[in-house]
């Protein structure tokens, strides 16, 4: 295995030696989440300077149920000293009622680093290590979305603003390269092959206005469906929650349905279309856009799913103000406040991604579990690749 034409062992040795020179005899705090990026960054630093590293999990309240305890146990099994710092109430109180995606991400970033700054001071540390990788700063500097862990690349000087020096040993690597390092370092498979999880956690999957009830519903259905979601042949699969969308139509939508009928050979009526209230992130050219998402319902769901790629090719030419399209895979029920969207993608580098086919029985099993939560009224499967969509919604 090679990274940048270097033997992986040589590459790791160079990283470790570089970390030793930078850190010297100073103390280091490592921000860890249980993801492969932050774990590899923390573990490399531990290999370099040993117990001068203190690893912290910041409990923002946006992790999945039971995740923090599991992550702490796994990291400790590797030899790391791990502490959990609970600031969930602070994050909830600061974010309640906020609906703009960029505002939510920026509030999260500010609170996150203010918290870390206090911990760095308490631990008498000079450095903060984090697992920023290339797609994080590429998407942020390119204006696609603000990643919470990008500072220096956008002109923020952490030593002046927060009082610590930042170390990002993986900042020029991509996800597949980080996984190569993790495998060589014998990091537990549960971490190594863990699906990516955004730094702000479930906050960015509570799309639109943040409400505690919305978060509770998302946490609940995520627990119900976690094992089923892992059965999808995907690099990443997850659920996001939205306000119940409204029925809609327009000349462009009518034109799209005509095109869908041509693609599928369906005649007659039976289609319903829904517009989501929330704007979602998409990509046009090299720029980010916040645009609309359309939901399509037809009683023969399997028929629509079978031609999803053709629908995706057709819709951007017809619907100029939409960057995403999703197929309703449940029967709508009148009760309930929220809709759930299933998102699954296949990718090697997370810069582009396709949407996998999902067995209809598996999809129905996921729907059945989601609909056990009476707060949910509809379930959709997002069929939009990256681009024109991003993987996450905010």
Residues covered by each model-derived region:
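ATP/NTP-dependent adenylation/nucleotidyl-transfer catalytic domains that generate, transfer
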Residues: 1-394
């Amino acid at each position: 295995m090679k990274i940048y034409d270097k033997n992986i062992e040589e590459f790791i040795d160079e990283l470790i030696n570089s970390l030793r020179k930078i850190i010297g005899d100073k103390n280091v705090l490592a921000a860890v989440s249980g993801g492969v990026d932050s774990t590899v960054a923390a573990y490399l630093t531990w290999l370099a300077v040993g117990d001068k590293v203190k690893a912290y999990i910041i409990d923002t309240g946006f992790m999945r149920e039971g995740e923090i305890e599991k992550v702490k146990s796994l990291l400790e099994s590797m030899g790391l000293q791990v502490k959990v710092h609970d600031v969930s109430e602070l994050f909830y109180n600061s974010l309640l009622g906020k609906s703009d995606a960029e505002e939510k991400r920026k509030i999260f970033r500010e609170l996150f680093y203010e918290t870390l700054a206090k911990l760095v001071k308490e631990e008498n540390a000079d450095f903060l290590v984090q697992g920023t990788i290339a797609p994080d700063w590429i998407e942020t500097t390119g204006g696609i979305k603000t990643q919470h862990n990008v500072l220096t690349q956008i002109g923020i000087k952490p030593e002046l603003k927060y009082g610590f020096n930042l170390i990002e040993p993986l900042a020029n690597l991509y996800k597949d390269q980080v996984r190569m390092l993790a495998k060589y370092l014998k990091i537990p498979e549960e971490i190594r092959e863990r699906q990516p999880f955004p730094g702000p956690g479930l906050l960015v999957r509570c799309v639109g206005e943040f409400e505690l009830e919305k978060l509770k519903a998302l946490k609940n259905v995520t627990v119900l469906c976690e094992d089923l979601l892992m059965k999808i042949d995907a690099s990443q699969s997850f659920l996001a929650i939205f306000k119940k969308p409204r029925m809609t139509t327009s000349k462009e939508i009518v034109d799209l349905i005509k095109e869908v009928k041509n693609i599928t050979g369906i005649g007659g009526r039976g289609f319903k279309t829904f517009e989501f209230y929330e704007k979602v992130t998409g990509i046009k050219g090299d720029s980010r856009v916040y645009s609309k998402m359309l939901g399509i319902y037809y009683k023969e769901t399997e028929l629509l799913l079978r031609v999803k790629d053709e629908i995706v090719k057709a819709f951007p030419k017809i619907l100029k103000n939409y960057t995403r399209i999703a197929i309703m895979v449940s029967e709508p029920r009148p009760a309930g406040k929220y809709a759930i969207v299933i998102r699954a993608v296949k990718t090697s580098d997370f810069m582009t991604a396709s949407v996998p086919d999902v067995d209809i029985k598996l999809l129905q099993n996921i729907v059945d579990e989601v609909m056990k939560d009476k707060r949910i009224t509809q379930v959709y499967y997002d069929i939009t690749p990256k681009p024109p969509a991003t993987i996450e919604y905010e």
